[in-house]
Regions:
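Specific aromatic-rich, kink-prone transmembrane helix
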Residues: 113, 134-157, 190, 358-361
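Intrinsically disordered, polar/acidic, low-complexity terminal segments
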Residues: 2-67, 71-110, 161-162, 191-223, ...
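Transmembrane alpha-helix segments characteristic
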Residues: 14, 111-118, 222-232, 313-339
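Hydrophobic/aromatic-rich transmembrane helices and adjacent perimembrane loops
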Residues: 127, 134-138, 343-368
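Transmembrane-helix signature of polytopic, membrane-embedded enzymes
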Residues: 100-121, 139-140
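Membrane-embedded glycan-lipid processing machinery
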Residues: 28, 80-84, 123-134, 347-351
Length: 477
């Protein structure tokens, strides 16, 4: 009970910290992505014709419910969406706390450091733009699904609740919540289910109960099938959508662009990985292109190696799933954003919540490896002779130094970013207060000011402000 309290306390404090931050760094004003949403869905947010469209899954159905509640009860207040984002972020932190409760190898200090990184302000752009709450909810949903899968694998699928959740979570997440963000999630799940099925198939004769082995394989198959079904539904819906990429500077294929300038893609990935450790502004101060800094991407490979070398996957697959998800998310962002031909595009704060899965997985891996090393150090010499890891002492020391160095760098980088964002918060709020005044005076404001401060086409801004004014919503409430 005491451990649960200690594990839950950082989650609550992190939520309260983010609520404090958004009220000091943001304001209730519809701008940027909100302009498109206002013009598309308001004021008749309950109109079925706007809901039942061929590309409904790309529009994320759960956002319709959130929009209805916001308009009907809160007058379309952007703080409502931001609070949803904070609570969604807290849900992911709660999943990490649940995992730490189940896996006592994660020490409390390691857990605190992970929570500190998790609640850092490197995600400020996503959290202060209320429309991003569904992305945060999606990531937390993925964390929950991975935690359920980890528990099911560790307990041989003995819990009915685990089996049911593994069957229905892909449908709930992909169809209702996470459609646009579910590509990497689905790939990692299918790889995990395939590996688990093969492991059970190969080791079935050695298990204490063959019936449980068959039940596990059936659970993995059902989970994989529902994942494929959910993705087929989403991809069909996505095929009906029409996308407009504002700011895209090329129309050639990714293969042609890679052949023309392969180093661009490498720089894109390296800078994106670096941004998940240290904030964008701080990276620019440190000149992220330096040879020392780009080596950060090797930590992903180190984490994968450690999961295999110490056979952590036999006890828990959760950290490995997170590491793979983080790496996959980097590739997906590259695949979606390379068309802008800006190698710093992947460093945007809006993607940090997706990258952070990998960082959390790396830190969890290090925590578990550190626990294994500590246990071996406490064994008797006779036990060491039977179970020791074959690395030499120098190699083990080097490994510990590398893990400690990355952990310190990650904590320091996120602390630096958070400190800088706390100092910047009043200026961000002041900027949005100017945006609010321009929105209130949209009829007389210049096109340049509307585009600069409300981050959208001036005509679209005026149309959106007119809708809000006529219905007494948002800044006109």
């Amino acid at each position: 009970m005491k451990r649960r309290v200690f594990l839950g306390l950082p989650v609550i404090l992190g939520i309260l910290f983010y609520i404090w931050y958004i009220f000091h760094a943001s304001d209730n004003v519809a701008y940027s992505d909100y302009i498109r949403l206002v013009n598309s869905y308001l004021p008749d947010v309950t109109n079925p014709a706007k809901f039942f469209v061929p590309d409904i899954l790309t529009r994320v159905p759960i956002t319709y419910l959130g929009r209805i509640i916001n308009v009907k009860l809160f007058g379309y207040n952007t703080y409502f969406d931001m609070i949803l984002g904070v609570l969604s972020l807290g849900a992911g932190a709660a999943v990490l706390a649940l995992y730490a409760e189940r896996n006592r190898s994660v020490g409390y200090l390691s857990f605190l450091l992970i929570q500190f990184v998790y609640f850092s302000l490197n995600k400020w752009e996503m959290m202060t733009n209320g429309t991003g709450w569904v992305c945060t909810l999606s990531i937390s949903g993925f964390l929950f699904h991975f935690a359920v899968l980890d528990h099911a694998a560790a307990t041989r699928c003995r819990n009915m609740s685990d089996r049911v959740l593994l069957a229905i979570l892909p449908i709930l997440l992909v169809v209702l919540v996470a459609g646009p963000y579910s590509g990497g999630y689905a790939v990692i799940l299918l790889l995990a289910y395939g590996a688990l099925w093969l492991a059970d198939r190969r080791g079935g004769a050695e298990t204490s109960s063959r019936s449980w082995s068959r039940k596990c394989r059936r659970t993995w198959c059902i989970g994989a099938l529902t994942t494929v079904l959910a993705m087929v539904l989403y991809l069909w819906s996505n095929s009906q959508a029409v996308y407009v990429h504002r700011g895209a500077v090329t129309d050639v294929s990714i293969a042609q662009e890679f052949a023309a300038q392969p180093l661009f893609f490498l720089r894109f990935l390296l800078k994106a990985v670096a941004s998940s450790v240290i904030g964008v502004a701080q990276i620019q101060d440190l000149e992220a292109g330096s040879p020392w800094f780009v080596r950060l991407h090797l930590v992903y490979l180190l984490a994968l190696y450690l999961n295999v070398r110490f056979q952590l996957y036999k006890k828990t697959i959760f950290p490995l799933l997170l590491v793979l998800s983080g790496g996959c998310n980097h590739l997906l962002v590259l695949a979606a954003r390379w068309i802008f031909l800006k190698d710093e595009y992947g460093m945007s704060s809006r993607y940090e919540i997706q990258y952070q899965m990998g960082i959390v997985g790396i830190l969890l891996t290090f925590a578990l490896v550190w626990s294994v090393c500590r246990e071996k150090a406490q064994e008797t010499e006779a036990d060491k002779a039977k179970t020791r890891v074959p690395e030499k002492r120098a190699a083990r020391t080097l490994l510990k130094v590398c893990m400690l160095a990355f952990t310190v760098l990650t904590v320091f980088g996120n602390a630096w970013t958070t400190r800088a964002e706390i100092r910047t918060a009043p200026y961000r709020k002041a900027y949005l207060q100017v945006s609010r005044e321009l929105g209130l005076n949209y009829r007389t404001a210049s096109d340049e000011d509307l585009e600069t401060y409300l981050h959208n086409d001036p005509d679209a801004v005026r149309d959106a402000m007119r809708i809000l004014e006529e219905n007494h919503l948002n800044i006109f409430r």
